[in-house]
Swiss-Prot record:
Site feature (Cleavage) residues: A39, A40
One GO process term, biological-process aspect: sporulation resulting in formation of a cellular spore
Homology family: Belongs to the Phr family.
Quaternary organization: Interacts with RapA and inhibits its interaction with Spo0F.
Protein name (database record): Phosphatase RapA inhibitor
Keyword Secreted: yes
Propeptide boundaries: 1-39
Source species: Bacillus subtilis (strain 168)
Gene Ontology cellular-component terms listed: cytoplasm; extracellular region
Effect seen on changing H37A: Restores reduced sporulation efficiency in a phrA deletion mutant
């Protein structure tokens, strides 16, 4: 039960992070590649 709850929470967190990155990239189209690269590097 707990592992299932943790998996769901992790999925929501990842989805939210991805949405935030996409919105930010859309707002700053000029630095889209740079923004995505920084975000990807911060994830690891």
């Amino acid at each position: 039960m707990k592992s299932k709850w943790m998996s769901g929470l992790l999925l929501v967190a990842v989805g939210f992070s991805f949405t935030q990155v996409m919105v930010h990239a859309g707002e700053t189209a000029n630095t889209e590649g740079k923004t995505f690269h920084i975000a990807a590097r911060n994830q690891t």
